Design a protein with these regions (language model features):
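Two-component histidine kinase transmitter core
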Residues: 77-80, 156-158
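Conserved long alpha-helical elements within nucleotide-processing catalytic cores of c-di-GMP signaling
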Residues: 1-21, 28-55, 64-68, 72-73, ...
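Residue-level recognition of strand-loop junctions within catalytic nucleotide-signaling folds
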Residues: 35, 75-79, 101, 122-123
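PAS/PAC or PAS-like capping segment
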Residues: 27-28, 157
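Cyclic nucleotide signaling catalytic output domains
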Residues: 63, 91, 95-99, 105, ...
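Short conserved AdoMet
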Residues: 58
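Short, well-ordered beta-strand segments
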Residues: 23, 72, 118-120
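Residues immediately flanking
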Residues: 27, 77, 117
Length: 176
């Protein structure tokens, strides 16, 4: 269902000749919490993150869990020019990040995670949902490689990383 919504919203960007953005969020430090505190705590953390994401997204945007500790937000109707759309997408990413990295208290334990975000600006010309996710994923891994809690916007001139430089989880999801 998430992918159907994404397809519909991406088509709307093309119809309205307006830029949107696909944001791919990956939690920094989730695996460690899940491994050390257990899957129940990890599941609670994912539920809390999903709630925070839902509360902090703009009303016109859609959000969903892609899988594991990755989430997607599709921000639409950002602007009619690329520069302004990039600025707005970056501000949206930072706002989401601020809400997600707030500590979570569970049974007296303070859980702290980070969030790296890759952004694929959606031009008024249509690209496939799979390509948009793949390119947002590339930007997200660049953000993660530069530093935790990073935000990176994909640009088509960026070289695509080799399959060896992408973690096994991501390769499995993208079919590499």
């Amino acid at each position: 269902m998430l992918f159907e919504h994404l397809e519909h919203r991406l088509a709307a960007c093309e119809r309205h000749k307006n830029y949107g953005a696909l944001l791919l969020l990956d939690l920094d430090g989730f695996k460690e919490i899940n491994d050390t505190r257990g899957h129940d705590v990890g599941d609670l953390l994912l539920q809390t993150i999903a709630q925070r994401l839902e509360q902090s997204r703009r009303q016109e945007d859609i959000a969903g869990r892609l899988g594991g500790d990755e989430f997607i937000v599709l921000a639409q109707q950002l602007a009619s020019n690329q520069e302004l759309a990039e600025e707005k997408a970056f501000r949206i990413a930072r706002k989401l990040q601020e809400s997600l990295i707030e500590p979570i208290i569970y049974d007296g334990i303070k859980l702290q995670i980070g969030c790296s975000i890759g952004i694929r600006l959606m031009e008024p010309q249509r690209i496939s949902t799979a390509q948009a996710i793949r390119e947002a994923d590339i930007a997200m891994y660049r953000a993660k490689r530069n530093r935790n809690n990073g935000v990176q916007i994909f640009t088509p001139t960026q070289p695509v990383p080799s399959a060896d430089s992408i973690p096994i989880q991501a390769r499995a999801m993208s079919g590499l």
